[in-house]
Amino acid sequence: VAKDLSLSAARLEAAWAGLDNVTAAKKELIEEAEMEPEDDFGEQMKLCGQAGSVWKSVTAGSEQIIEGCKDIVDEVGSQKIGKPYTGEDVNYIESPHSWNSIEDFYDNIVSVRNAYFGALGATSAQTYSVSAYLAGVDQAANEGVISAIEKCLEKIAAMPKPFVKNYKDAKVKDAIDACNDLNDALEVARQALIND
């Protein structure tokens, strides 16, 4: 399992940064498994709207990022937090033994913020980000996403720890609702882009 995970992580890094931009050990691991990524995802994103890009427009590339964000938010809200809370599957709790579930949920939403703002660790829109692009199309939709991201982070952080012992707390429902609100805001943003 560890080898498969290591290979998957190396392949993901190579798909984003390009095979020539990973360590020699990772490149060797990927090549030995014959699992070279077909496209350099990061380069494809940078080329949105240009000839040869997977995404024929900046809008299409932005929509792809928003869809990925929606997938993450839905997984956090309806599955990772929601399944235990609703009783659908109380064994679905992420990191139950380390008691890090809430940190994991929070970090998942931070990854959405990073994707939306266009950089790792970004707390505001970078020049070439979905947020900056959407602001030029529909500033209200952009502000709605930003506000919903921050509210979602706030509500997840407010859940009592550890999650494994508090998954029925009322603040858990607040976090689920905030995830749903963020998903709705992302859909408004997606619609604003495709209807522009």
Labelled PLM ranges:
Residues V1-D196:
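Mature extracytoplasmic or organellar-lumen-exposed domains after removal of signal/transit peptides
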